[in-house]
Regions:
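Pre-Walker A adenine-sensing motif
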Residues: 87-97
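Phosphate-binding/switch loop-helix module in NTP-utilizing enzymes
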Residues: 169-227, 293
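ATP-binding Walker
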Residues: 100, 112-113
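P-loop (Walker A) phosphate-binding loop of NTP-binding proteins
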Residues: 109
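Conserved P-loop NTPase
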Residues: 171, 190-192, 265-310
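Conserved P-loop
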Residues: 115-164, 168-170
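Hydrophobic anchor at the beta1->P-loop junction of P-loop NTPases
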Residues: 106
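Haloarchaeal acidic low-complexity proteome signature biased toward cell-envelope/secretome components but also
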Residues: 1-89, 310
Length: 310
């Protein structure tokens, strides 16, 4: 079962998520060649308007002080199960880790490492033997796998072992069919047994809606369904042009449980620019309020939690 076109004859994406077929096959970012957005991880996809191929599935800066925490650690001792983000230094800024099943967001401008952050977040789960789903609205499946390989992360092997699904979706088609995709994605999360999920980037989805109220309601409904599915989810978002501390449309920071801000910071002498991360909020967790420098290296993001920016 599952042969032929993975999305059935009525693929609403016109082949844009896979490598073939429909009139809009040049759409934004499907897989190259085989047309299987899950990297081979699929069962029999029933042809039809309400099944999108998710069905029947059988993831030395200047020395500074240690992170400052605002509250008594005992205040946050509870039965909440927590997990690390998977980024060196950043995890040390979060006391005990983020609560599992949280909805997280990372906000940043171009070149701040949002996709690297997301891949590293997912890699943490995969290397721990868990499963993950990566949904990209702006790249192909192959480019995501290539980027992970360049960082030394075994995403292709995880996909071959049916522990990782990388799905490339055209943002226009996603916006047009969001309620159906939302329902099928929730089913995929459950049947795939995903522990973590990434949506890169929610900004492209937001851009598909012209009316602010429609944009808010659609994004809210989508993120709420992810929250209710029980998977720990990370959304990437472009920063506002006006301030690095807000997302482009000012929505995701209010819908998510945790917000990480990535930005370029320029020194007072204007001669040096550094990358800096700040934890804007984490519900049910104590965390550092300091802004800390980080680098994007050939092995991922490293945060210097013991250092000052300049």
């Amino acid at each position: 079962s599952g042969g032929g076109r993975p999305f059935g004859a009525d693929d609403p994406f016109g082949g844009s998520r896979g490598g073939g077929g429909g009139p809009s096959g040049a759409g934004g970012g499907g897989t190259e060649g085989g047309g299987d957005p899950f990297g081979g991880y699929r069962g029999a996809a029933t042809a039809g308007d309400d099944d999108f191929g998710f069905g029947d599935l059988g993831g030395d800066a200047d020395a500074g002080g240690p992170p400052d925490f605002d509250a008594d650690p005992d205040e946050f001792e509870s039965e909440i199960t927590r997990t690390d983000i998977g980024i060196e230094g950043l995890d040390d800024m979060i006391l005990g880790g983020v609560p599992k099943r949280s909805l997280l967001s990372v906000i940043g401008g171009a070149g701040t490492g949002k996709t690297t952050f997301a891949l590293q977040f997912l890699n943490r789960a995969l290397e721990s033997g868990n499963r993950g789903i990566y949904i990209t609205l702006e790249q192909t499946r192959e480019s995501i796998l290539d980027t992970a390989t360049e960082k030394g992360w075994s995403f292709r092997e995880h996909a071959d072992e049916d522990r990782l699904a990388v799905v490339a979706i055209d943002p226009i088609e996603m916006a047009n069919s969001l309620s159906s995709i939302r329902n099928d994605l929730v089913r995929l999360i459950s049947e795939f047994g995903a522990d973590r999920l990434v949506l890169d980037s929610v900004s492209l989805l937001e851009m598909m809606y012209d009316h602010p109220a429609k944009r808010r309601s659609e994004v809210f409904g989508f993120t709420r369904s992810l929250k209710e599915s029980g998977v720990t989810t990370l959304l990437t978002s472009e920063a506002s042009e006006d301030t690095p501390y807000a997302s482009r449309h000012g929505i995701v920071e209010y819908l998510t449980d945790a917000v990480f801000v990535l930005q370029y910071v320029r020194g007072s002498d204007f001669r040096e620019t550094r990358l800096a991360v700040e934890i804007q909020k984490i519900r049910d967790a104590n965390h550092s309020r300091e802004t800390k420098p980080y680098d994007i290296t050939d092995t991922g993001i490293s945060v210097y939690d013991q250092a000052n920016i300049f």
